[in-house]
Amino acid sequence: MGIKLINIGFGNIVSANRLVAIVSPESAPIKRIIQEARDRGMLIDATYGRRTRAVIITDSDHVILSAVQPETVAHRLSTKDDMAVDEDDE
């Protein structure tokens, strides 16, 4: 089984195997999750100063902010043209 990588915008890449959820940042509970992650030091801001459009939650409790729409991230996750790394190649 290889490692599947997904582009979350501006050349930032995340391991797709570690994703738990891709959500919109608009609701109050998600804003609370973002603030709690910031307080714990588990927030990764990959927006490059742009508006946050997607919040990615990982199985390690890291919260990643992306400037790409959640639908776009999900579409990249489901396509076959994504980046895949075989463990044998490493």
Swiss-Prot record:
Pfam families: RemA-like (PF04025). Transmembrane segments: none annotated. InterPro entries: RemA-like (IPR007169). HAMAP family: RemA. Belongs to the RemA family. This is Putative regulatory protein Cbei_1140.
